[in-house]
A protein has these predicted regions:
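Glycine-enriched, solvent-exposed interface loops adjoining structured elements
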Residues: 1-128, 132-176
Length: 176
């Protein structure tokens, strides 16, 4: 089941799964020179969540279709560029109207991406590719006569929200 948790709700889950709660209530100790444990845990929790968005299996994440939020600009070399919206962590699937299969998404340092610099090795409409770099996608599809049908991404939610599948909470490790 997909969850949408506030920072306080996620912090409560984080404390329980890291074995920091329930607290002992049979004694009280008060210190004024200690660390702000909640701030430390929130920072640790945020780092864990951003790593989850970047690396977790897709069934643990919420996918967003951002097709309506993007614009396509044509380049001189029959490629096209899409500027991705702020907060796009991962591009999952891109579908074009003139292609029988989804676009293969790669990074600039792969051999497939490097081949796109040679006009004799570039991808065509049958097997288009998109190079994901610096919040943009450069699409090589053999022509610039295409439209985007669907663009699925993992988006970072608004500040203070955590969107994930309930099963992802099991990935929170206890403090050793």
């Amino acid at each position: 089941m997909k969850l949408r948790l506030s920072t306080d709700e996620m912090l409560s889950q984080w404390r329980m799964r890291r074995a920091l709660e329930p607290l002992r209530s049979d004694c009280t100790v008060e210190r004024i020179d200690g660390i702000d444990l909640d701030s430390f845990l929130k920072m640790e929790m945020r780092d864990w969540y951003l790593n989850l968005l970047d690396t977790a299996p897709l069934h643990l994440l919420t996918l967003t279709d951002i097709t309506s939020k993007i614009s396509l600009s044509k380049n001189d070399d029959l490629s096209a560029t899409i500027r991705l919206p702020q907060g796009c962590r991962r591009v999952i699937e891109l579908t074009l109207d003139n292609s029988p299969s989804p676009v293969k998404i790669t990074t600039p340092d792969t051999p497939l991406a490097i081949c796109q610099q040679n006009p004799f090795c570039q991808s065509g409409a049958v097997s288009p590719i998109a190079i994901h770099s610096n919040n943009s996608l450069i699409i090589h599809a053999g022509s610039d006569n295409f439209n985007i049908v669907q663009l699925l991404c993992v988006m970072e939610p608004d500040e203070g929200l955590y969107e994930l599948d309930e099963a992802a909470l099991s990935l929170i490790s206890q403090i050793p």
